[in-house]
Structure formats: structure tokens, C-alpha cells
Amino acid sequence: LHAEESIELLETIPINKTLFGKTTIESIVDRGAGKGSFIYTKKVLSSKEDGKPLAIVYSNTLARADGGWAKTDSFKKKPTLIQTSNPPVGEPDIIDNIETLPQAALLYRLCGDMNPLHADPVIAKKAGFNSPILHGRCTMGIAMRSLITKCCDFDATRLAQISVRFSSP
């Protein structure tokens, strides 16, 4: 289950070049028996031509029901992927309502995330949702688009980093 994602954009990502990503596991945290484990990864996205890093993607994945394996406390210290703070007080600075297609989760699924939670109504209901839900990364992409249009005057190069935590609606 995708828990957190942070993207740091080092350069403008070219649309006409071949890219590659190298992923490393940064940490695995045992949350305890029946609570699962967090798997923290770092992916460096680079140009295949010259190897120049273009972006760094940090992810936190929850392996549900895979906890209780650590024999020492060294696997129980959680790194900080996303700095938390108190929610802001008052009205939001900007509200952007973006309508998505009813089949958006099925289209995004073509990226390779075949979790049935995003496609199968029966599985979604068993998980406590009324219907299949949109992927977290797809929602993140929609939020990024909104930030670029509303806060960056349509200039994607002005967005240097975004971090999100995926939680229940």
C-alpha cells in the first residue's frame, strides 16, 4: 500500500530523451506483529545519454500484515520522509476543483499498478470503499497540475519539490 511520496525535480525532464531509474531500498521498518512494515525507497531518475540525475523520488510503501519480524530496535526507527506540521488555520489560499473521468483509475492502471482496489468494485467494498479508488500517484499528479496552473503560472520549472502522504479519505 502506497503511504508517502516525495519528488525532487533537479532539472527539467526532457520529453524527447530516454531516461532510466535506479531504485535502492533506504530502510525497512518493522511496525510490529499485525501492523506491517514500512519499506522506504529512493529512485534516481537520470538521462540515459549522459547519466545526469534529473529527479529523485522517495517512496514509502506499507507491507500490510508483514510486521513482527525485527529482533532488534534498529529496524523500528522510522526515517522521516515527509516533515509533518500542524494543519494551517483558516480558509485555504486556493481551491481547485478538477473533474476526473469515471474510468481514470482504469486508465492509470495501464502504468502497471494492477492492484484490484482500483478496478474491482467487490474488492473495493471489502476494503471499505463505495467503489474502486483512484491511485495515490494519479491523485498526486492531478494535484501537481493544479499547483502548476494556479501557483506557477503554467511554468512547470517553478515546481521544485512536492511531498504527499496518502491516507484514508
Task: Describe the residue ranges of each PLM region.
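Catalytic strand-loop segment that frames the active site of acyl-thioester-processing enzymes
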Residues: 61-134, 148
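HotDog/MaoC-like acyl-thioester-processing domains
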Residues: 4-96, 161, 166-169
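A general, composition-driven signal for non-globular sequence regions
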Residues: 21, 36-37, 129-131, 139
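Active-site helix/loop of acyl-thioester processing domains in fatty-acid/polyketide metabolism
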Residues: 1, 5-10, 48-49, 107, ...
